[in-house]
Amino acid sequence: MANNPGALSQDDIDSLLESINSSESLSLDESLSNVISSPTGKKQKVKVYDFKRPDKFSKEQVRTVSSFHEAFARYTTTSLSALLRKMVHVHVASVDQLTYEEFIRSIPNPTTLAIINMDPLKGSAIFEVDPTIAFAIVDRLFGGDGDTIKDKSRDLTEIEQSVMESVIIRILANMREAWSQVVDLRPRFGHIEVNPQFAQIVPPTEMIILVTLEVKIGKVEGLMNFCLPYITIEPIVSKLSTRYWHSLIGVGTTSENLDALREKLENTAMPLVAEIGEVKLKVREILSLDKGDVLNLESSLINKDLTLKVGTKEKFKCRMGLMGNKVSVQITEKIGDIKGFDLLKELTEEVE
């Protein structure tokens, strides 16, 4: 067949398609800015509203969520540093609202996706740890330095998943504390997914709020993401505003506040230490201490009351003995005034 001199070649067609795509790629902001102007003739800045993905959270609510997770990041920095016995730094990189589909597309595959039940709220959330951080944590807990990650593209083994499960459960306790001002959140670990496509907790078009945390463990840097669907926190979304916080400031001390304070104090862990005795040693003796060395205490301590400390305060006298096959102490008397532990009673009297 003879070539038609007026026909377009394949290269011409490809060039036309490319030019059309490039013109369509211009943002709507740029297009509107070229046609909309003020009465004075100056161009006005126009904000685009996408009806396919309407904002569910106001800027004020996003800022409130950000402040909660700044506290969460501080708590997590402390808990992970203690767990890994290595300097860990966690901070909030961004808080955005987007569709669930966009979130799923933005994370690597494989990764570590923990499905979280957000009791007492209905629905689930996702806590994602990217492979770089997950393998650094696992390597450190297995005795490594956590800085050398050979293969980040593989799935976690069953043992490694079990280790990450315990770490995530530890982190979730920090989340409960961070959200305690608006809800008594009791996040419960559900299960781990490694393929984001299998973690369908809401429809793809559902709006979520995404908290991205930058994490540094020694020399390793990576991300953690907390995905919270709007339908999950919809019952408390009205509390994520300054109006709600101002109303709390005006309430003052009430029986409800005292109940919350009482619950906090009653669930606060306090160390109790029974001092068996003390030994004075010279510095050179301390430096030479080794496994198997014996420190001689007073023989009279066996029948002598010991001091029981609550925190750093001496509060009770006790006597050492056995309960079953365990060494135990029995409280024999209170030491002085324990009024410092009766704060709740004083507060209750003030309200009355």
From Swiss-Prot:
- Provide this UniProt record's keywords sorted from A to Z: Bacterial flagellum, Cell inner membrane, Cell membrane, Chemotaxis, Flagellar rotation, Membrane
Per the UniProt record, one Pfam family is FliM
Compartment(s) where it occurs, according to its Swiss-Prot or TrEMBL record: Cell inner membrane; Bacterial flagellum basal body
Q: Which GO terms describe its biological process?
A: bacterial-type flagellum-dependent swarming motility; positive chemotaxis
Q: What's the main place this protein lives?
A: membrane
State if Acyltransferase is listed as a keyword. Answer: no
Q: Which InterPro entries match?
A: CheC-like_sf (IPR028976), Flag_FliM (IPR001689), FliN-like_C (IPR001543), SpoA-like_sf (IPR036429)
Q: Does the keyword Mitochondrion apply?
A: no
- Residues folding into a coiled coil are none
What is this entry's stated membrane topology? Peripheral membrane protein
Q: Name one GO cellular component term.
A: plasma membrane
Q: Which PANTHER family match?
A: FLAGELLAR MOTOR SWITCH PROTEIN FLIM (PTHR30034), YOP PROTEINS TRANSLOCATION PROTEIN Q (PTHR30034:SF6)
* Annotated family: Belongs to the FliM family.
Its biological purpose? FliM is one of three proteins (FliG, FliN, FliM) that forms the rotor-mounted switch complex (C ring), located at the base of the basal body. This complex interacts with the CheY and CheZ chemotaxis proteins, in addition to contacting components of the motor that determine the direction of flagellar rotation.
Q: Which NCBIfam families match?
A: fliM_switch
Q: What is this protein called?
A: Flagellar motor switch protein FliM
Species of origin: Borreliella burgdorferi (strain ATCC 35210 / DSM 4680 / CIP 102532 / B31)
